[in-house]
């Protein structure tokens, strides 16, 4: 995916999510270190029971399936988002989001 295009795609997520070194929980949890993170793992965020019980470890495949249709992947999620259907946009969004480590720093390539 294209990181710059993914950064632009992330504008759809910014109403509820932050990412990067100053990221904080908002309507949704901050997304630093998402690649390999377990669902329901961010301290101080009140997840839905469905999300906590989902047992997801976020990988590229899990992320794309979820972002395409959150309520189909995790029935009962409180994430209110219609989803992103275009594979190219999902590729770019994952390229952007997955580059941040748990401290919000861009990982060395």
UniProtKB/Swiss-Prot annotation:
Binding site for heme c: 13, 16-17, 79
Key words, A-Z: Electron transport, Heme, Iron, Metal-binding, Transport
Gene3D superfamilies registered for this protein in UniProt: Cytochrome c-like domain
Signal peptide from the UniProt entry: none
A Pfam family hit: Cytochrom_C
Superkingdom of source: Bacteria
UniProt xrefs under SUPFAM superfamilies: Cytochrome c
The record's account of how the chain is modified after translation: Binds 1 heme c group covalently per subunit.
GO MF annotation list: electron transfer activity; heme binding; metal ion binding
Name of the protein: Cytochrome c-550
Lineage of source species: Bacteria, Pseudomonadati, Pseudomonadota, Alphaproteobacteria, Hyphomicrobiales
């Amino acid at each position: 995916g294209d990181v710059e295009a993914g950064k632009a795609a992330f504008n759809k997520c910014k109403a509820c999510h932050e990412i990067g070194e100053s990221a904080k929980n908002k309507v949704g949890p901050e997304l630093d270190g998402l690649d390999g993170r377990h669902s329901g793992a961010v301290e101080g965020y009140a997840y839905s029971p469905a999300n906590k019980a989902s047992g997801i470890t976020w990988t590229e495949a899990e992320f794309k399936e979820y972002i395409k249709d959150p309520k189909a992947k995790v029935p009962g999620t409180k994430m209110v988002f219609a989803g992103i259907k275009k594979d190219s946009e999902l590729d770019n969004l994952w390229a952007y989001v997955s580059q941040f480590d748990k401290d919000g720093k861009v990982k060395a390539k």
